[in-house]
C-alpha cells in the first residue's frame, strides 16, 4: 500500500518486533499506517502512544465519538485509507449500516444527536479551516 519500505511482521526483530507484538496484543493486528514507521521504531512508538491516547484514553468522549471524529477528519483530509481504517473501527459501535455509511460519506446527512453533530461540525471546521476557529467555537 505505501511507497515507503516497511519491515514485514514476520521478519521484524529487536524494537520493531516488540512494537509489532504490542500492537497485536492491544489491537489484534498491525495496521498499515503504523507499519510505515517501521524504519524508525522510536517514531512508531510515539505515534502509537499518541494514537492510543487520542482514541482510547480517558476523557469525556466515547469510543464511537472518537471514531466518528476520526472519520470526519479523514474525510476532510480526503484520505480514503484513513476513512476506511476508522470506518472499520466505527462499525464496532454503529450497528446501523445506513447510518455508518452516512457518517463515513457525509455526516451532515446523518441522523445524529445534537451533541454528536456539534462535535463533528467542530472537527470538520478545525480540520478544513483552523485559522477560522475562534475562542467562542471552543467555549
Predicted regions and their residues:
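Hydrophobic alpha-helical segments
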Residues: 1-139
Amino acid at each position: 500500500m505505501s511507497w515507503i519500505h516497511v519491515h514485514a511482521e514476520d521478519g521484524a526483530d529487536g524494537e520493531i518486533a516488540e512494537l509489532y507484538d504490542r500492537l497485536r496484543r492491544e489491537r489484534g493486528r498491525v495496521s498499515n499506517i503504523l507499519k510505515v514507521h517501521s524504519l524508525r521504531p522510536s517514531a512508531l512508538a510515539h505515534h502509537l502512544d499518541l494514537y492510543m491516547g487520542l482514541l482510547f484514553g480517558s476523557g469525556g468522549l466515547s469510543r464511537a465519538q472518537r471514531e466518528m471524529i476520526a472519520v470526519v477528519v479523514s474525510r476532510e483530509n480526503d484520505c480514503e485509507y484513513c476513512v476506511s481504517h476508522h470506518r472499520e473501527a466505527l462499525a464496532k459501535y454503529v450497528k446501523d449500516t445506513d447510518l455508518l455509511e452516512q457518517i463515513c460519506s457525509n455526516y451532515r446527512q446523518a441522523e445524529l444527536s445534537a451533541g454528536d453533530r456539534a462535535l463533528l461540525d467542530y472537527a470538520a471546521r478545525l480540520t478544513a479551516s483552523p485559522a477560522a476557529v475562534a475562542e467562542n467555537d471552543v467555549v
